[in-house]
Amino acid sequence: MAKYLAQIVVMGMQVVGRAFTRALRQEFAASKVAAEARGRAGTESAAVSSLSGISLQEAQQILNVSKLTPEEIQKNYEHLFKVNDKGLGGSFYLQSKVVRAKERLDQEMEIQSKTHKPKEETTQT
């Protein structure tokens, strides 16, 4: 009786082990496909974030923009830069943050324009 019980337990563990291994392989494959789907633009954006020291979300919050439109970014940048002018009682630190945020958003718009141009060229031909 104990022998049969031990065999059942061992078989059950083997089944669970195989199922776990299969699920793990599927998860790795899905992760790889998702990473490839994000493409190079996500990698470039992450690299720019690490170089500039400011994330895209933080830059958008600083300049109070939700969409990356050059006009809105420039308008908010000029306003915040003038308001934080040290000569007018503003903060040089905040002014620096505003400049870094604008630089980061400009870099992101450049990356987006690079990734959208090849797609547009292929649709035109």
From Swiss-Prot:
Q: Which Gene3D superfamilies match?
A: DnaJ domain
Region of interest (J-like), ranges:
58-110
Subcellular location per the Swiss-Prot or TrEMBL entry:
Mitochondrion inner membrane
Keyword Oxidoreductase set for record: no
Primary location recorded for the protein, binned into one broad class: mitochondrion
Q: Which GO terms describe its cellular component?
A: TIM23 mitochondrial import inner membrane translocase complex
The yes or no answer to whether the keyword Membrane is present is: yes
Q: Which UniProt keywords apply?
A: Membrane, Mitochondrion, Mitochondrion inner membrane, Protein transport, Translocation, Transport
InterPro entries documented for this protein: J_dom_sf (IPR036869), Tim16 (IPR005341)
Gene Ontology biological process? protein import into mitochondrial matrix
> In what way does this protein cross or attach to the membrane?
Peripheral membrane protein
What family is this protein classified in? Belongs to the TIM16/PAM16 family.
What function does the entry list?
A: Regulates ATP-dependent protein translocation into the mitochondrial matrix.
Record text about domains: The J-like region, although related to the J domain does not have co-chaperone activity.
Subunit comment: Probable component of the PAM complex at least composed of 1 mitochondrial HSP70 protein, 1 GRPE, 1 TIMM44, 1 TIMM16/PAM16 and 1 TIMM14. Associates with the TIM23 complex.
- Matches recorded under PANTHER family: MITOCHONDRIA ASSOCIATED GRANULOCYTE MACROPHAGE CSF SIGNALING MOLECULE, MITOCHONDRIAL IMPORT INNER MEMBRANE TRANSLOCASE SUBUNIT TIM16
- Name recorded for this polypeptide: Mitochondrial import inner membrane translocase subunit tim16-A
Q: Which organism does this sequence originate in?
A: Xenopus laevis (African clawed frog)
Q: Which gene is annotated as encoding this protein in its UniProt record?
A: pam16-a
